[in-house]
Amino acid sequence: ADCVGDGQRCADWAGPYCCSGYYCSCRSMPYCRCRSDS
């Protein structure tokens, strides 16, 4: 499956989903973006 990396827009509920090692952060509204897990 495709995934998006650091700083890219994501959506926890419907995708696009973050690559391994990233999580979808929605703090910077209105968009969610992938951030590093570490």
Swiss-Prot record:
One of its GO terms (molecular function) is toxin activity. InterPro entries: Beta/delta-agatoxin_fam. Expressed by the venom gland. Keywords: Amidation, Disulfide bond, Ion channel impairing toxin, Knottin, Neurotoxin, Presynaptic neurotoxin, Secreted, Toxin, Voltage-gated sodium channel impairing toxin. Insecticidal neurotoxin that induces an irreversible spastic paralysis when injected into insects. Modifies presynaptic voltage-gated sodium channels (Nav), causing them to open at the normal resting potential of the nerve. This leads to spontaneous release of neurotransmitter and repetitive action potentials in motor neurons. Belongs to the neurotoxin 07 (Beta/delta-agtx) family. 02 (aga-3) subfamily. The presence of a 'disulfide through disulfide knot' structurally defines this protein as a knottin. This is Mu-agatoxin-Aa1c. It comes from Agelenopsis aperta.
